A protein has these predicted regions:
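Conserved motor-coupling elements within RecA-like helicase/translocase cores
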Residues: 68-85
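SF2 helicase catalytic motif II
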Residues: 81-84, 88-91, 96-147, 152, ...
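Conserved Walker A/P-loop ATP-binding site and its immediately adjacent core
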Residues: 3-54, 88-93, 121, 145-147
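Conserved catalytic network of the ASCE P-loop NTPase/AAA+ motor domain
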Residues: 24-29, 54-57, 75-79, 99-103, ...
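Interdomain motor-coupling "hinge/lid" segment immediately C-terminal to the ATP-binding subdomain
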Residues: 156-170
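Short, hydrophobic beta-strand segments that form beta-sheet elements in well-ordered domains
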Residues: 35-36, 63-64, 138-140
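Conserved RecA-like helicase motor-core motifs
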Residues: 32-33, 55-68
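N-terminal regions of ATP-driven nucleic-acid and macromolecular assemblies
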Residues: 1-2, 151, 168-171
Length: 171
């Protein structure tokens, strides 16, 4: 479990996210999903980067909007595995009502990790995942190092909130 902090403007978030996803998909024998939070604005770039890495994007990547997708449809989507892009609030609801079983999640990837506070939906998703599952990874990426340096121990709070043990700082 790790938090990677990269310099703003280098496009590192998409590259790191694609690398995490590609590596997790290398062990594709199980049908457990990889949940990607906060990817709404980067979906196109993420698809393109995964395609460049040789991943069959159409086969392994799905997205759902909770308001447009029914509960049974989301349950089937999670059961097929692969990469699921969804909002943190939708993931919270699905974890709480049993649509998404935390023990069946391969891992969670949180983009824009600097936004995670103790009361954020992303933090709640990670807490639910950690409380209900002993397996699986949590990886996070931030492209706003200045937001992690401001305030009192902001980086330490984000690390604690996301339950990660390692921080990687990239230029």
């Amino acid at each position: 479990d790790a938090l990677a902090v990269v310099a703003r403007g280098l496009g590192g978030t998409v590259h790191l996210a694609a690398d995490v996803i590609r590596r997790a998909l290398e062990t594709r024998e199980d049908a457990r999903p990889i949940i990607v939070l906060n990817a709404q604005q980067r979906e196109g770039a993420l698809r393109e980067e995964l395609w460049r890495c040789g991943v069959d994007v159409d086969k392994v990547m799905a997205r759902h909007r909770a308001a447009e997708t029914g509960r049974n449809e989301r349950r089937a989507l999670y059961a097929t595995g692969g990469v699921v892009l969804c909002g943190a609030r939708a993931a919270c609801v699905d974890l709480l009502d049993g649509t998404l079983d935390a023990s069946n999640i391969k891992g969670i990837l949180v983009l824009d990790a600097e936004r995670c506070a103790e009361s954020s939906p992303e933090a709640f998703v990670v807490r639910l995942f950690r409380d209900r599952s002993t397996q699986g990874f949590v990886r996070a990426v931030s492209e706003a190092p200045e937001r992690l340096g401001g305030g009192f121990a902001k980086l330490a709070k984000v690390v604690k909130t996301l339950s990660v043990s390692t921080v990687a700082l990239w230029p």
